[in-house]
Design a protein with these regions (language model features):
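Aromatic- and acidic-residue-enriched carbohydrate-binding clefts of CAZyme catalytic domains
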Residues: 1, 32-58, 63
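Generic, well-ordered alpha-helical scaffold segments in large soluble proteins
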Residues: 12-16, 20, 68-76, 112
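Flexible, acidic glycine-rich loops studded with aromatic residues
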Residues: 79-95, 100-189
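Carbohydrate-binding surfaces of carbohydrate-active enzymes
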Residues: 54, 64-86, 183
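Conserved, mostly hydrophobic/aromatic
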Residues: 24, 73, 97
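Single conserved hydrophobic/aromatic residue that forms the stacking wall/gate
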Residues: 1-5, 9
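Active-site groove signature of glycoside hydrolases
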Residues: 10-32
C-alpha cells in the first residue's frame, strides 16, 4: 500500500512539474525505528532482505523503496535525485546523489559512476551563523560558517581520478527556512 501511495503522490508531481529530475529525499528515514516496527520487519522478512558487513536490513529496505521509486520515475521519463543517505543499502542504478554530510557520499557515488551535486553542510548551508557572536545574530540552526569558508570550497575532490571527477556536476547551497521567520532574515542569511 505504501508504494502505491508513493506512486500516486509522485504521479501528481509529474503532472504539475515538467522537470526531468525529481528529488526523493532519502534523509530523515528513521531506520532505528524500523528496527522495532513490526510492519517494517514483516516487509523485510517478506522481501528476504539481510544485513551484511556493509548494510543493515533496514538500509536494504530503504534501498528497495528508492529503487522502486526510481523505476517508476524512469518509466515516466524522469530521473531521481536524493540525499547521500540513498547510498545506504545500495544505490539505485540511475540516481544522482546530493552529498550534504560532507564530501564522502559524493566521492563514493562518483566512484560508482553516478552524477553528484556537492552540497556539504560545513561549506554550503546558509542557515548557519555568519558571525561568532551568535547572541547578536539572527537565529541560525548550525554552527559558525563565515563567507571566507564558503568561498574557499573546492567541489572537485582531489581523491577522485579525472574519470571520476566528471561525475561531479556542480554545487548547491542550502537555506532551510524552518527557522527563518521573515523574508529579511532569509536575505540576511
Amino acid at each position: 500500500r505504501g508504494l502505491v501511495g508513493s506512486e500516486m503522490c509522485i504521479r501528481d508531481r509529474i503532472e504539475i512539474f515538467p522537470s526531468e529530475y525529481i528529488h526523493v529525499g532519502g534523509d530523515e528515514c528513521p531506520k532505528v525505528r524500523w528496527e522495532k516496527c513490526p510492519k517494517c520487519q514483516a516487509r523485510i522478512k517478506a522481501l528476504g532482505l539481510k544485513s551484511d558487513k556493509n548494510h543493515s536490513k533496514e538500509e536494504r529496505l530503504q534501498s528497495f523503496v528508492i529503487n522502486h521509486i526510481e523505476k517508476f520515475l524512469n518509466d515516466h521519463g524522469r530521473q531521481i535525485i536524493g540525499w547521500d543517505e540513498i547510498l545506504e543499502g545500495g544505490l539505485a542504478p540511475n540516481a544522482t546523489v546530493m552529498s550534504w554530510r560532507g564530501e564522502s557520499g559524493g566521492i563514493e557515488a562518483a566512484k560508482q559512476k553516478h552524477d553528484v551535486i556537492m552540497t556539504p553542510n560545513t561549506y554550503l548551508y546558509f542557515d548557519y551563523y555568519q558571525a561568532k557572536d551568535t547572541e547578536n545574530e539572527p537565529f541560525g540552526i548550525g554552527g559558525y560558517l563565515p563567507m571566507e569558508r564558503v568561498y574557499s570550497y573546492e567541489p572537485m575532490p582531489a581523491s577522485l581520478t579525472p574519470e571520476e571527477q566528471q561525475y561531479i556536476k556542480g554545487v548547491q547551497a542550502n537555506l532551510w527556512t524552518e527557522y527563518i521567520a521573515t523574508f529579511s532574515h532569509a536575505q540576511y542569511m
